[in-house]
Swiss-Prot record:
This is Lon protease. It catalyses: Hydrolysis of proteins in presence of ATP. It is an enzyme of class 3 (hydrolase). Its main location: cytoplasm. Homohexamer. Organized in a ring with a central cavity. Residues 601-781 form the Lon proteolytic domain. SUPFAM superfamilies: P-loop containing nucleoside triphosphate hydrolases (SSF52540), PUA domain-like (SSF88697), Ribosomal protein S5 domain 2-like (SSF54211). Its EC number is 3.4.21.53. InterPro entries: AAA+_ATPase, ATPase_AAA_core, Lon_bac, Lon_bac/euk-typ, Lon_lid, Lon_proteolytic, Lon_Prtase, Lon_prtase_N. Induction: By heat shock.
């Protein structure tokens, strides 16, 4: 880009876009190539290129910060012209800058780029720093000494003008500005030289800095002697390689191989890569240059690209506002109060300790209850990048940790790939379906996960392909699972389990009303007054067309209605419609599901149990009857082993206490008892139907009708104790929905009644029981 005039404000202030570098200091009259990869920098370059304007190049104070604030940037920089040397496939640039003059940044501001994606970048109004080029005789001698001493270093610089190798009065200020680039000065020293307007004082500072460097070299001389042999060998190799390169260049036979190598070296020198990574990259670059065939070159180049593109210092700033996190979670997710409370507590401790170490969150719950979207909301709330790896069905350890480079087509594992995609060292990293990890002869991925999730080890994670330690300690890992019992025990030990239960119908209604309908209307290009849903219509969809723990089927049903309505809009010129129960039936046709309701008539031997299912809960009718026989018991209804045992325990308890219950003990040898649980196509298991089975048997034997509005749940022992069960919330809601408002449950489950919505609790009677006598006294006396 040619040197063009920059914009001026109404007050004649000069304005230019600002490129912030990681410790690279520019000077007037110099020329250097820089790799540009940060989004802000790319946006600033594109804007300046489009407007054909020069830029201010200035360094940030701390090179390790990925996104410096205004206060973390030096206020003196260099106005530069620039040309784009190369644009890389990932959108980054190689830019050659030419320094024009020293400038003082008066005011640094931000603005957004043009185009669809708005990226903020810095611009500034600035003023030129007037330079004093007068020299005393002693300083004239000093510049001659410096030029003579460091002539080779200057000559080795890629863009140093050969015409300036001979010192003259006209070019001495140019030589002084090139010297800090040729010599190994610290960032602070380089910035001091940029901010100094006096040529005489700049020479004095350079003399001072080089003397300090010489003292340091003298201290290290003994160490240098010990490695002279190896160094001499390396210098010889370097010399010969450069000779070959020079000959090829002279013949016009220079290939892109050398250009690639030099570009990689520049990128490594100009960025704060960890020392062991720098060493490995430079070693691989040497192999790249000496590779003799295209396959070898391609493999080396691919490996270097993976190694150099991984994030090592880039990070997003941490968010310290719990209120912001809470707002995002509440806006994106209805209900789940206890889950959100646990997440807030977990994040609060991380924020306070400023440490990434600690247990890993694992969200456990049925499909569709919002585990993945919760993880995405956490990333959004913390303003962090979000990446996801699906672990379902993974059986090969190499999928996680990569294949060794000796294999054809070797690549890094999914962890390294995801980190490269994130582009920062501290993303939110979702490990989806961790309970579905498998294992076979190729290895055990669950064991490989231990290195990744253990905070004491994951700062040295080793991928088989990368072969260098990589730090995962800044990553916020979140795992998800459907079934907690399927998580391998060593992994389970490292996880903090947060359980998400299935949504109630009221919760599903609120989610559909406040989230799903709005989302689907936007997707279908419909306005909110074109298609409206009543509460009755949405409730009918939930009850009669879906049976699930989450809301995915509800979303599909609403989307189906929206599609069919759009078709009618096009064909029948229908302008708007309100969707109630009848409209739902019209669009979705025949109902798919029904929920179990209480019987209208009372009958001996029939009792309502309460079932917990993956779709929430349901009433579980239990029937018992007997006929003359020889004391046999028949059990039907597709009952699994545990529930069959519950039938036998219930019968054993009744037999033992027959006299107390007013039953002749002899009758058990004279009848055959039959226990049946309807809906035989559905497998049923668990011990929680114990007291319902006992009541059904007693009701049949005593010929006592149990009111159909009664439902019960609880495990029973042979001594008549009623033991704690799970799924209190789901069972209670389903019982109320089915018409049962008089519920018996174990005393020990009292602690879970707070989970039951108030609108349900206020309309039912709950009897808490310690022993079966409490049930018997209420129903049979």
């Amino acid at each position: 880009m040619n040197n063009k005039k920059n914009e001026k404000t109404t007050n004649n202030k000069e304005i230019a876009n600002v490129l912030v570098t990681r410790g690279i200091v520019f000077y007037p009259n110099t020329k250097i190539r820089i790799e540009i990869g940060r989004e802000k920098s790319i946006a600033a370059i594109n804007d300046s290129k489009e407007k054909k304007q020069n830029m201010i190049v200035v360094s940030q104070e701390n090179p390790s910060i990925d996104s410096p604030s205004k206060n973390e940037i030096f206020t003196v920089g260099t106005l530069c012209s620039f040309e784009i040397d190369n644009k890389h496939p990932d959108g980054s640039y190689s830019i050659i800058f030419t320094g024009i003059k020293r400038v003082k940044i008066n005011k640094l501001s931000e603005k957004a780029s043009d185009g669809e994606i708005k990226t903020k970048f810095f611009y500034a109004d600035y003023s030129e720093i007037e330079e004093d080029t007068k020299l005393s005789k002693s300083n004239e001698e000093a510049i001659k000494d410096l030029h003579a001493k460091f002539e080779n270093e200057l000559n080795n610089l890629t863009f140093f003008p050969k015409k300036d190798l001979a010192l003259s009065k006209e070019n001495r200020h140019t030589i002084v500005d090139w010297l800090p680039i040729a010599l190994k000065f610290s960032l602070e020293e380089k910035q001091q030289l940029l901010e100094e307007p006096s040529l005489s004082k700049r020479i004095e500072k350079i003399l001072s800095f080089t003397i300090d460097e010489r003292v340091s070299q003298k201290i290290d001389s003994e160490i240098s002697k010990k490695i002279n042999t190896n160094l001499s060998k390396q210098q010889k190799e370097f010399y010969l390689r450069e000779r070959v390169r020079a000959i090829k260049e002279e013949l016009g036979d220079i290939s892109s191989k050398e250009d690639d190598a030099e570009s990689i070296r520049d990128r490594v020198r100009n960025n704060p890569y960890p020392e062991h990574i720098k060493k490995r990259i430079l070693s691989e670059v040497n192999k790249l240059e000496s590779s003799s065939n295209s396959n070898e070159y391609s493999m080396s180049k691919t490996y270097i690209d993976w190694l150099i593109d991984l994030p090592y210092w880039q990070k997003t700033d941490d968010v310290d506002s719990l209120a912001d996190v809470e707002n995002v979670l509440n806006n994106n997710h209805y209900g789940l109060e206890k889950v959100k409370e646990r997440i807030i507590e977990y994040l609060a401790v991380r924020m306070k300790s400023k440490s990434a170490k600690g247990s890993i969150i694992c969200l456990v719950g049925p499909p569709g209850v919002g585990k993945t979207s919760l993880a995405q909301s956490i990333a959004e709330a913390l303003k962090k990048k979000f990446v996801k790896v699906s672990l379902g069905g993974m059986r090969d350890e190499a999928e996680l940790k990569g294949h060794r480079k000796t294999y054809i087509g070797a690549m890094p594992g999914r962890i390294i790939k995801a980190m490269s995609k994130a582009g920062v060292v501290n993303p939110v990293f979702l490990l989806d379906e961790i309970d579905k990890l498998g294992s076979d002869h190729k290895g055990d991925p669950a064991s490989a996960m231990l290195d990744i999730l253990d905070p004491e080890q994951n700062n040295r994670f080793s991928d088989n392909y990368i072969e260098e330690d990589y730090d995962l300690s800044n990553v916020l890992f979140i795992a998800t699972a459907n079934y907690e019992e399927n998580i391998p025990e060593p992994l389970h030990d490292r996880l903090e389990i947060i359980r998400l239960s299935s949504y109630t119908e009221n919760e599903k209604l609120s989610i559909a009303k406040n989230y799903l309908v709005k989302k689907i209307l936007v997707e279908s290009a419909l306005k909110k007054d074109e298609l409206k849903f009543t509460d009755d219509g949405l409730s009918y969809i939930i009850k009669r067309y879906t049976r699930e723990a989450g809301v995915r089927e509800v979303e599909r049903a609403i989307r189906q209605i929206a599609r069919k309505f759009v078709v009618r809009q096009q064909k029948e010129k229908l302008t708007s419609q309100t969707i109630g129960v009848e409209e739902v039936k019209y669009y979705l046709k025949k109902e798919i599901y029904d929920y179990t309701k209480k019987d209208k008539e009372y009958m001996p031997g029939v009792v309502n149990g309460m079932a917990y299912t993956t779709a929430g809960g349901d009433l579980l009718p239990i029937e018992a009857t007997f006929a003359p026989g020889k004391g046999k018991i028949e059990i039907t209804g597709n009952l699994k082993e545990t529930m069959k045992e519950s039938v036998n325990v219930a019968l054993g308890y009744v037999k033992t206490n027959a006299v107390k219950f007013g039953i002749d003990p002899k009758i058990f040898g004279e009848i055959d008892l039959h226990v049946h649980v309807p809906s035989g196509g559905i497998p049923k298991d668990g011990p929680s139907a114990g007291i319902a089975l006992t009541t059904a048997i007693l009701s049949a034997l005593k010929n006592v009708k149990i009111p159909s509005n009664v439902a019960m749940t609880g495990e029973i022992t042979l001594r008549g104790r009623v033991l704690i069960i799970g799924g209190v919330k789901e069972k209670t809601i389903s019982a109320y929905r089915g018409g049962a408002n008089d519920i018996f449950m174990p005393k020990e489950d009292e602690r879970y009644l707070d989970d039951v919505p108030e609108e349900v609790r206020s309309k039912i009677k709950i009897t808490l029981v310690d022993t079966y006598d409490d049930v018997y006294n209420r129903l049979f006396k």
